[in-house]
Amino acid sequence: MNFSRIFFFVFACLTALAMVNAAPEPKWKLFKKIEKVGQNIRDGIIKAGPAVAVVGQATQIAKG
């Protein structure tokens, strides 16, 4: 009887520790992925800026 109570207490403590330690990890990974996507979009827009300007000038030259 005492062994089962001790076993249950140890199991409950280990489960609680596992949940507390594992909880923040996925949240931060999700935000880091979102941040990385935002940085890639920003960098793509910055790199595409001169090309868009050249295309705009070319269309104006073509229109006359």
Swiss-Prot record:
Primary localization class, coarse: secreted
Post-translational modification: A protein with the same sequence as cecropin A, but lacking the carboxyl blocking group, has been isolated and called cecropin C.
GO biological process, one term: innate immune response
Superkingdom per UniProt: Eukaryota
Keyword match Methyltransferase: no
Localization of this protein: Secreted
Propeptide, residue positions: 23-26
Keywords: Amidation, Antibiotic, Antimicrobial, Immunity, Innate immunity, Secreted, Signal
Keyword Disulfide bond attributed: no
Transmembrane parts of this sequence: none
GO cellular component: extracellular region
In-chain residues carrying the UniProt-annotated modification Lysine amide: 63
Signal peptide: 1-22
Family classification: Belongs to the cecropin family.
Task performed by this protein: Cecropins have lytic and antibacterial activity against several Gram-positive and Gram-negative bacteria.
Protein name per its UniProtKB record: Cecropin-A
Lineage: Eukaryota, Metazoa, Ecdysozoa, Arthropoda, Hexapoda
